[in-house]
Amino acid sequence: MIFVDTNVIIDVSTDDSAWADWSQEQLDSAVRREPLAINEIVYAELSVGCRFPDEVDALLTRFGIVIDPTPRRALFLAGKAFQRYRRAGGTRTGVLADFFIGAHAVIADSVLITRDGGRYRTYFPGIELITPSVN
């Protein structure tokens, strides 16, 4: 299973001028190798740009993405990684979701497609990422 970060789905669904092509190429390549998945956190983040759950579901169907429920071990790992981040001076807002996403990919022993590799590499050493070469 290959996990997909929120930004990759948003890039393609909004036809982002800077990232849509890269993100679409990664999704196309990945889906030929393994099933694509997100967790509940990514679903919640995607809902911000939609009016109804059916719209989020349609996005997932469009890209062939399934929802993989977050295991408790991943929730625990996310909390511990976020704790390290805060102790290192990280802000309280806007990043906790990334820790849930990264921890889930680690516990599932999965690859994560994202444009934001830095934080994942720092707090989840050894995580396998597909990122743009600029990261």
Provide a role label for each language-model segment.
Residues V12, E40, P71, D116:
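Nucleotide-sugar donor-binding loop of glycosyltransferases
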Residues R33, R62-G64, D109, G126:
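A generic structural signal for alpha->beta connector loops
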Residues M1, G102-N135:
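Acidic, PIN/NYN-like endoribonuclease modules and their adjacent C-terminal/linker elements
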Residues V8, V42, A74, F100-I101, ...:
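Alpha-helix capping/helix-boundary segments
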